[in-house]
Amino acid sequence: MPAPVVYYIRHGETAWNAIGRLQGTQDIALNELGHRQAIHAGDVLAGLLTRDGRDRHLLPFVASPLGRARATMELVRGALDLPPQDYAIDDRLREIAYGAWEGSTLAEAQARDPELYGRRLVDKWNVAAPGGESYAAVQARVSDWYRGLAGDTVAVAHGGTARALMVSLGFETPQSAADLFIEQGAVYVFNDGGQTKHV
């Protein structure tokens, strides 16, 4: 049986994304650009589902519990002419927790915790922010989510969970994924053949 195909969308931009603040588990709303990105991702997804012969009415849709992911999901589903709120929530898709660094820019985090910041710079996958979690921990919960999929799925979540999924599926290494930019307004397709990005 082939591995499930995941159509993965990162949430649209927020005010904190725009100014480089670490969001983590904070619930920051989409900004105007973020709304447009979400609708665009829905349009891109519609084309991909048509290309792949998938019935949008039969595919499961699942989102992170954070508001920016849920708002993006509802805009995506609206673009697909589906009931906006008819989707599942899975806590394993929540963003990496940055603990005490949430709300800070990277420069502010470095000024506050220079020693830990330096260690994390060297090993971003395994070193967590104070009171936060490591990418390795995120990878464990995202891997658990993926193993439980019964079939092809549309997921809306975060940059951190995308990186963790890419490593879980063997498409990236922890070193390559740690600094990988995950685009907003795009659809990433993960399948047996690898990963592709569609904008």
Locate the predicted segments by residue:
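Active-site-proximal alpha-helix that buttresses catalytic centers in soluble enzyme cores
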Residues: 7, 13-82, 112, 133
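Alpha-helix C-terminal capping segments
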Residues: 143-151, 190
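Short, well-ordered beta-to-alpha junction loops that form the rim of enzyme active sites
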Residues: 63-66, 92, 157-160
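Short active-site segment of divalent metal-dependent hydrolases/proteases
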Residues: 14, 161-162
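Phosphate-handling substructures
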Residues: 78-141, 191, 199
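Active-site signature of alpha/beta-hydrolase-fold catalytic machinery across serine-
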Residues: 75, 164-168
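Generic beta-sheet signal
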Residues: 6, 59, 148-160
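Domain-level recognition of soluble alpha/beta enzyme cores
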Residues: 136, 172-198
